[in-house]
């Protein structure tokens, strides 16, 4: 074998990298176990803050690097937020009453629902049609776009400016969402802009227990404010006094001590505090001393033991605290006693990021803001900002330039004039992003903010300033909430399905190919699994239930490569070759089939990754990684082991069969090409039946992914008949908004699981409404109806919505898909399946250089797809589990295409090989022989894959059962279509071409 050293080097590097990244998961699990033994929550957090894996990586880094669990396994919330592009354009426009503008906006909004073009393109095209002689600059030469659009700007320049503003709005929304989630304390959130879906952000938040709060937080407008501030030395006496009164046991004060009295005590207290908690002290934020010492310090100084006052002139920064102590500080500074002691015009706010120089210790600043208005609001808000950008000053130092409109410029001049030498705090959503010193009065509305900034700091600050002029808040257009109990159940089901599938595969390989080859293939499976998990860990990917299914399915497809190799080795040994020559020929001859089949699977995997979202991407990621790893382990690693062991005498007599498999399907001479008329007729009848069912009779059971609506998975307080629940819910949901106002919403109920007390309710109730309150209202309607029917016994709707409270009935998971998202999912599903077929057609054509193979592949794949969809059409409602068409089903269809093409490529590869070996043999005999020669491999691979899929289907739980069922259908019918459809079609096309070529040749002669 060539390049053996390179293969070994790659294997060693992969092994070391996998061990390194997977070790973070082990370390995190160990630290969590040790921390769980500590009863005191503060001491527990101190322990986590103090530990360092390998003496380098803190606990938080371990947490971020470990393989995380997705929402379906851990529980949590997944939302897609949409920033309305029409709203952004509308804010930027002047002359909004202009008839042409209004009509163009109306037409563009209507067309957006069905067009694949983006809104700006539609708007510009409509404006040109409605007002052909006018320029867009007439509408958009506004103060908002000053410097970008003037009355002389061309339409292309205006369109470019609009696109830049839309992109900026999306970036601003991304930053606001990220900051709000950080503020909420979500561990390992995933926030990303959805490629190809303008204005949409996907947010995954594991472990969320309060979805109502998060909905309000994510959909609120950004609140950017400019505040005047106190100097830290002005506020320190009050904080010292508050600390002393707390130490004396006071919880409420009737009168406020004078500032003079507080000041008199200042020097002594400050001296004690700075001695214990100096900024230069290496122990800030770390676990120092015993629990008893910490308790004594907190008793003596309830506030100043956790909040360090800043010495000297620190402008608005009055103190520092570790992130773990901020909640305790908040409890004190917002207490009734604090209201009595602290100035009434004081507002204390935390910094958005850790203090400079203390980021590793998570030390945050506490700023003192000053109320100067009668209504208690900030004197200046973010809506006055017209632009903000990061740049460099004349000395090459990073700074931020900020421009305001005329009203803002006037107010800004007054604020800066009144606060010379003081700080003005820039606050977004209640957190201070910076508090620069005012050096001079600023007039004209243009300012520069400089300091000890890095380039990243100025970029973040510029984005923060631009966040204040968000034209419209983001709204949730798709949502999924999974309770932690359901997540734990999914983990158990996923692990069981994986373990059973793996054991069955190991046994099957030993039965078919003897102990040593079988166990070597099993070791390759283990290596494949190890490398896959290691690569996932290096990507910091979250493991989902579809992801586990992807790994399990990878085991089935990994067996395919070993089966191909072993079957070729058996053929070579039957031909009289020794073990060494048979091994070399077997690996060499199987390579092209393995490469082509894996590459075509990669095509569908990449399409899934690009077009899918959420769980489908999780499946695609693990599948792609698994395909690559299985190719490496099966083709290269096992060969190295075999070649290294051939020097052993017992290996020279190694067989690749057992008594069971020795003569299995050997010397088969089935004339498959003679059946093509019969198989074509049967296939045509089946296709017609399924097409009639899909389009004219039963249709498809479409999920909310394609129709829009809400899903609720609910545990009830008793076993029920689904029909009884349907009767209760039939008229419960009546639309109150949109075109269907006053009409009952479409509501369906299906049973889940085997216990009889779990159902799923789907409804399109008020789904067209943009009001965030509709989500809570829908849950209230559901609760009232089920409560009235006696199916839940919770005291109130809040307990009904708590997934942790199972007794009495509760919502354990929920999801929502808006109509615009449903439309995009539908288009995306059609596009992804079409792309898969097109790319596979092109690849087969390029690789095999023959149109017949491409046509045969695509015809068979199209039939496979139709049969699976047709089964779902005919069987839904008659089987005891859901057969809905959803995103997961589309993922299954693409996986079926990827798997099915594997089998077809292997058959075609043997046909291609035989065409070279026997160029004069007639095509009918050649095709029949090729199919018979690969029949053992076809049956073995299909059977091993079905073992895996049956394991997922039986043990994987409701969330993945429909996916497994579609795959089982796809594998079964895909195997049949390889033999009875793809090969005969290729035979007919090739035969016709050969017949024409011979005819032309004879005519020339």
Placement of each model-derived feature along the sequence:
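Interfacial helix-loop-helix hairpins and adjacent transmembrane helices
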Residues: 1-21, 26-63, 67, 87-101, ...
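Interfacial segments of transmembrane alpha-helices in multi-pass membrane proteins
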Residues: 2-4, 400-401, 405-420, 424-425, ...
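Hydrophobic alpha-helical transmembrane segments of membrane transport and translocation systems
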Residues: 8, 527, 534-535, 571-592, ...
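Small-residue-enriched core segments of transmembrane alpha-helices in multipass membrane transport
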Residues: 12-15, 518-540, 551-558, 619-634, ...
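Non-transmembrane, solvent-exposed regions of membrane trafficking/translocation machinery
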Residues: 22-28, 49, 65-75, 81-429, ...
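Pore- and gate-forming transmembrane helices of large, multi-pass membrane proteins
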Residues: 177, 485-505, 557, 577-613, ...
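Juxtamembrane "pre-transmembrane" interface segments
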Residues: 204, 444-448, 456-504, 781, ...
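Cytosolic juxtamembrane regions of multi-pass inner-membrane proteins
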Residues: 556-600, 643-651, 873, 879-941, ...
């Amino acid at each position: 074998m060539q390049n053996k050293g390179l293969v070994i080097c790659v294997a060693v590097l992969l092994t070391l990298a996998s061990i390194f990244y997977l070790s973070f998961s082990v370390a995190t699990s160990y630290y969590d176990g040790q921390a769980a033994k500590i009863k005191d929550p503060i001491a527990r957090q101190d322990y986590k803050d103090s530990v360092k894996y390998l003496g380098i990586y803190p606990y938080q880094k371990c947490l971020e690097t470990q393989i995380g669990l997705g929402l379906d396994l851990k529980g949590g919330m997944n939302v897609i937020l949409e920033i309305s592009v029409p709203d952004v354009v509308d804010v930027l426009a002047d002359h909004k009453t202009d008839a042409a503008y209004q009509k163009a906006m109306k037409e563009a909004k209507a067309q957006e629902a069905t067009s694949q073009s983006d809104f700006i393109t539609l708007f510009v095209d409509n404006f040109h049609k409605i007002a052909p002689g006018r320029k867009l600059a007439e509408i958009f030469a506004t103060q908002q776009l000053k410097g970008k659009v003037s009355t002389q700007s061309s339409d292309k320049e205006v369109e470019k400016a609009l696109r830049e503003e839309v992109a900026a709005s999306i970036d601003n929304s991304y930053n606001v969402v990220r900051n709000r989630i950080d503020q909420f304390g979500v561990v390992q959130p995933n926030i990303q802009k959805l490629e190809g879906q303008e204005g949409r952000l996907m947010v995954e938040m594991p472990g969320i227990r309060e979805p109502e709060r998060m909905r309000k937080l994510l959909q609120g407008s950004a609140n950017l404010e400019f505040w005047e501030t106190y100097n830290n030395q002005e506020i320190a006496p009050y904080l010292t006094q508050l600390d002393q009164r707390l130490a004396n046991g006071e919880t409420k004060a009737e009168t406020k001590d004078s500032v003079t009295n507080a000041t008199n005590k200042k020097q002594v207290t400050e001296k004690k505090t700075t001695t214990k908690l100096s900024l230069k002290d290496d122990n800030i934020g770390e676990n120092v001393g015993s629990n008893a010492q910490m308790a004594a310090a907190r008793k003596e100084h309830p506030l100043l033991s956790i909040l360090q006052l800043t010495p000297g002139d620190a402008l608005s920064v009055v103190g520092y605290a570790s992130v773990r102590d901020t909640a305790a500080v908040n409890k004190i500074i917002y207490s009734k006693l604090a209201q009595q002691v602290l100035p009434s015009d004081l507002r204390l706010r935390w910094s958005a990021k850790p203090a400079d120089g203390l980021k590793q210790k998570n030390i945050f600043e506490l700023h003192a803001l000053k109320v100067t208005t009668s209504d208690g609001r900030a004197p200046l808000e973010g809506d006055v900002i017209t632009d903000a950008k990061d740049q460099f000053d004349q000395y090459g130092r990073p700074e931020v330039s900020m421009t305001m409109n005329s009203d803002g410029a006037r107010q800004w001049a007054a604020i800066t004039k009144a606060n010379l030498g003081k700080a003005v705090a820039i606050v977004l959503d209640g957190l201070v992003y910076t508090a620069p010193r005012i050096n001079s009065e600023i007039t004209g509305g243009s300012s520069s903010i400089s300091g000890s900034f890095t380039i990243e700091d100025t970029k973040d600050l510029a984005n923060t300033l631009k966040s204040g002029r968000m034209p419209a808040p983001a709204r949730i257009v798709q949502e999924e909430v999974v309770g932690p109990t359901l997540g734990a159940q999914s983990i158990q089901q996923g692990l069981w399905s994986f373990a059973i599938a793996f054991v069955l595969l190991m046994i099957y390989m030993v039965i078919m190919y003897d102990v040593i080859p079988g166990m070597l293939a099993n070791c390759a499976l283990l290596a494949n699994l190890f490398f896959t998990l290691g690569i996932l860990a290096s990507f910091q990917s979250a493991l989902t239930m579809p992801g586990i299914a992807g790994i399990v399915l990878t085991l089935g497809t990994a067996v395919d490569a070993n089966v191909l190799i072993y079957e070729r080795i058996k053929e070579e040994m039957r031909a009289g070759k020794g073990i060494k020559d048979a091994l070399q020929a077997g690996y060499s001859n199987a390579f092209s089939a393995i490469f082509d089949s894996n590459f075509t699977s990669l095509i569908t995997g990449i399409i899934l990754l690009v077009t899918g979202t959420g769980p489908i991407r999780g499946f695609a990621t693990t599948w792609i990684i698994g395909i690559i790893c299985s190719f490496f382990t099966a083709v290269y690693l096992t060969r190295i082991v075999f070649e290294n062991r051939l020097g052993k005498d017992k290996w020279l007599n190694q067989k690749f069969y057992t008594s069971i498999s020795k003569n299995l399907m050997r010397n088969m001479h089935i004339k498959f090409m003679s059946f093509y008329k019969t198989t074509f007729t049967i296939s045509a009848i089946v296709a017609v039946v399924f097409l009639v069912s899909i389009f004219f009779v039963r249709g498809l059971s479409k999920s909310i992914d394609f129709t829009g609506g809400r899903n609720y998975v609910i545990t009830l307080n008793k076993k029920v008949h689904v029909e009884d629940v349907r009767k209760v819910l039939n008229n419960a949901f009546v639309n109150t908004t949109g075109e269907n106002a006053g009409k009952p919403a479409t509501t369906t109920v299906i049973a889940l699981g085997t216990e009889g007390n779990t159902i799923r309710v789907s409804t399109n109730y008020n789904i067209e409404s943009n009001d965030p309150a509709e989500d809570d209202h829908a849950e209230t309607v559901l609760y009232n109806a089920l409560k009235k029917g006696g199916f839940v016994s919770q005291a109130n709707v809040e307990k009904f919505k708590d997934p942790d409270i199972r007794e009495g009935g509760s919502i354990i998971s929920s999801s929502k898909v808006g109509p615009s998202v449903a439309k995009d999912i539908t288009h995306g599903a059609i596009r992804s399946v079409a792309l898969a077929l097109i790319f596979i057609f092109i690849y087969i054509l390029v690789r095999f250089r023959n149109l017949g193979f491409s046509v045969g592949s695509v015809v068979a794949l199209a039939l496979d797809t139709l049969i699976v969809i047709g089964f779902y059409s005919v069987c839904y409602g008659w089987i005891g589990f859901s057969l809905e068409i959803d995103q997961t089903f589309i993922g299954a269809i693409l996986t079926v295409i990827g798997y099915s093409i594997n089998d077809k490529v292997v058959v075609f590869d043997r046909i291609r090989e035989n065409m070279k070996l026997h160029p004069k043999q007639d095509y009918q005999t050649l095709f029949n022989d090729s199919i018979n020669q690969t029949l053992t491999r076809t049956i073995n691979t299909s059977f091993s894959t079905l073992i895996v899929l049956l394991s997922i289907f039986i043990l994987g739980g409701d969330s993945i059962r429909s996916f497994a069922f579609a795959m089982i259908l796809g594998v079964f019918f895909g195997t049949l279509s390889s033999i009875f459809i793809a090969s005969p079609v290729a035979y007919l096309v090739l035969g016709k071409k050969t017949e024409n070529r011979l005819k032309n040749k004879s005519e020339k002669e």
